[in-house]
UniProtKB/Swiss-Prot annotation:
Molecular-function annotations in GO: proton-transporting ATP synthase activity, rotational mechanism; proton-transporting ATPase activity, rotational mechanism
Its membrane topology: Single-pass membrane protein
Protein name (record): ATP synthase subunit b
Record InterPro entries: ATP_synth_b/b'su_bac/chlpt (IPR002146), ATP_synth_F0_bsu_bac (IPR005864), ATP_synthase_B_chain (IPR050059)
Summary of the function given for this chain in its UniProt record: F(1)F(0) ATP synthase produces ATP from ADP in the presence of a proton or sodium gradient. F-type ATPases consist of two structural domains, F(1) containing the extramembraneous catalytic core and F(0) containing the membrane proton channel, linked together by a central stalk and a peripheral stalk. During catalysis, ATP synthesis in the catalytic domain of F(1) is coupled via a rotary mechanism of the central stalk subunits to proton translocation.
Record's subcellular location: Cell membrane
UniProt similarity note: Belongs to the ATPase B chain family.
Source lineage: Bacteria, Pseudomonadati, Bacteroidota, Flavobacteriia, Flavobacteriales
Organism whose genome encodes this protein: Karelsulcia muelleri (strain GWSS)
Pfam family of the protein (one): ATP-synt_B
Segments traversing the membrane: 2-22
């Protein structure tokens, strides 16, 4: 069915009237709303772009911060290790110095104690050697005295026998024998004097021998 001309006419009139009404009352607000919406969309897109750039910048900053923090971390760790090594070295040096000082002190104390002990031992040895040498020399002197007394008694007996013979001859044979035997008497006196001088020399020799042995032992002790 084809529409009639009247219907088309009235429909077009209604459309025009509605278009005029809409354009006059509704078109501008709709356009404004659309413009606002478009502007909002454009602004939101721009803001999104800005946000993207801002996020990129933040990411870059984050990366830089992380890099810097890594560098700082390694730097701090290295510094901490260096300080630790320095502290350990200083502590080792201090410990070495303290141990060296303690060792030196102990060595000095040991040496002093050793010297004191050696001096005591030397003095004891010296005293013992003096006592022993005195005993030995006393024994030697006693032996020498015994030998000398024996020798002296023997010689006295010989001299007495000889003088007794001279005495008998002097009074038996007269004045001639007296003059002749006076020389023998002088000989006997000389022999007696020689004997006593010999005995003195023996005592002197023993005395010097004692001194020599004593000082020799003393030198040996001082050498040790």
């Amino acid at each position: 069915m084809t529409p009639s001309l009247g219907l088309i006419f009235w429909q077009s009139v209604i459309f025009l009237i509605s278009f005029i009404i809409l354009s006059k009352f509704a078109w501008n607000p709709i356009n404004k709303l659309l413009e606002k919406r478009e502007k909002y969309i454009i602004d939101s897109i721009n803001n999104a772009e800005k946000a993207k750039e801002y996020l990129k910048n933040i990411k870059l900053k984050k990366k830089n911060i992380l890099k810097n923090t890594e560098k700082m971390k390694y730097f701090i760790i290295n510094e901490a290790f260096k300080k630790k090594e320095q502290i350990e070295k200083e502590a080792k040096k201090k410990a070495k110095l303290e141990s060296y000082l303690i060792i030196n002190k102990t060595q000095l104390l040991i040496e002093n104690k050793k010297k004191i002990a050696i001096e005591k031992i030397k003095n004891e040895i010296l005293n013992m050697s003096i006592i022993i040498s005195e005993k030995i020399l006393n024994k030697e002197l006693e032996i020498n005295e015994k030998n000398n007394n024996y020798f002296f008694n023997k010689k006295l007996l010989i001299i007495m026998k000889f003088s007794y013979k001279i005495f008998i001859k002097r009074y038996a044979k007269g004045f001639f024998f007296l003059v002749f035997n006076s020389k023998k008497e002088i000989f006997i006196k000389n022999e007696i004097e020689k004997f006593f001088s010999y005995k003195k020399e023996l005592y002197k020799k023993n005395y010097f021998k004692f001194k020599y042995t004593f000082f020799k032992k003393k030198r040996k002790d001082n050498f040790f």
